[in-house]
Amino acid sequence: MHPYSDIFCKVYNEFGWNYYPEIFGEQLLQWLPRQGFAPKNAMDLACGTGILCRILRGAEIAADGMDLSQGMIAIARENVPEGHFDVADMITYLPGKQYDLVTCTGDAVNHIPALSDVAQIFRNVYGFLNPGGYFVFDILRHSEVSDSEPFEMDTSPTQRVWFQMTRPGENKVNLCIRVYEQGTLSFEENIRETLHDPEAICRLLEDQGFRNITCTDRLLPESGPATTWFITAQKAQ
């Protein structure tokens, strides 16, 4: 797992990728009371620009965040000045306090190729999650990820951004982002992810002690199927 460049963080924030945490946050705030659960605080792993933290804090859940990319955390601190944000590696991260709710969205777990490292993340989360607390995250669905046609858009009179997702291997995904200034390539970044077997992920959770584990293509029954699996797990009381 590698930190995003500052240029990519800026493109991410300006392009509109914040829509995903916005939709997820709205659904999460409906999902929580259906579990009879009212968390007082939350930690968002791989929080990106802090949008989910802002939504949770708007619902009086004291949400903090962490991300590997300094550029993402700089934007998160601007978006949520009252929150606490750390620049850290999710594999080894220990926040130094306990939380009722832990989230990890935007298929961040797919950025971790080794299942042994995923297991370490789950072990750490179990340790700083309060008894009875929930861990809610997502992973990409194999059937929903395929080679795509390039997509591009003008972000200013002189700048154009180009995207393409490809499957270079059976369980591999690559997202290529290019930025052109006045028609000349000025930046390129490739984001590589690994498609994980959801059953294997659920077994890892169980191995760490989590219970009430669910895996579904929709967080709410009434919402349409997503391109990700939503996985929820609870720490025993």
State the predicted function of each range.
Residues A200-Q237:
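C-terminal lobe and adjacent flexible extensions of AdoMet/dcAdoMet transferase-like proteins
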Residues Q70-G71, V109-L115, Q120:
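Conserved SAM-binding loop
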Residues A119-P131:
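A short glycine-rich, Lys/Arg-flanked "PGG" loop and its adjoining helix->strand segment in the class I
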Residues V136-L204:
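SAM-dependent methyltransferase
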Residues T105-D107:
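Residues lining the SAM
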Residues M43, G50-T92:
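Class I SAM-dependent methyltransferase SAM/SAH-binding core
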Residues M1-A38:
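Conserved class I S-adenosyl-L-methionine
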